[in-house]
Amino acid sequence: AIRRQRQMCIRDRNSTVDDAVTMIDTNVKGLLYVTKAVLPYMIDKNAGHIVNMGSTAGIYAYPGGAVYCATKAAVKTLSDGIRMDTIATDIKVTTIQPGIVETPFSEVRFHGDAEKAKAVYAGIDAIQPEDVADVVLYVTNQPKRLQISDVTIMANQQAAGFMVYKK
């Protein structure tokens, strides 16, 4: 479902509310369903680490991405709330907010237009999925006394949101 998810551009007459609902179902409700399923077990064991994947799009909105950006902002806010709700436990909650990561996301965003998707990464040494995985490993391998609540990672050529220098 995630790979078929289309970006909903509010100004685009061809985008539908169904596109937005799918995105909300995936990025927000999916997070809620999984958290609700695993959190009781974590509470019973007084241990665990929830790592939610946000995006710099949740910090810096960009044109044509209103709904996607809102769902990623919701990931951060939900994570903060879950952290507050579990403060009396040893459960950790981390939000990782990557910038431009070279994934199939752009192809989905541009409705299968591979050339347009490829252009997103042209001239930039984008973050790779393995880089994000390394950050997940880092935050989850900290001592019990330490919780990393938020991590924002960007390519060296990305200053903020969609502000990217292309060579």
Regions found by a protein language model. Give the residues of each.
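Substrate-binding pocket helix/loop in short-chain dehydrogenase/reductase
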Residues: 11-24
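Active-site loop immediately N-terminal to the catalytic Tyr-X3-Lys motif
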Residues: 62-66
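Single conserved hydrophobic/aromatic residue that forms the stacking wall/gate
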Residues: 1-6, 10
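Active-site helix of classical SDR
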Residues: 35, 71
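Active-site-adjacent segment of SDR/Rossmann-fold oxidoreductases
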Residues: 60, 81-91
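Residue(s) in the substrate-gating loop at a strand-loop-helix junction
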Residues: 55
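C-terminal helical subdomain
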Residues: 95-99, 103, 115-162
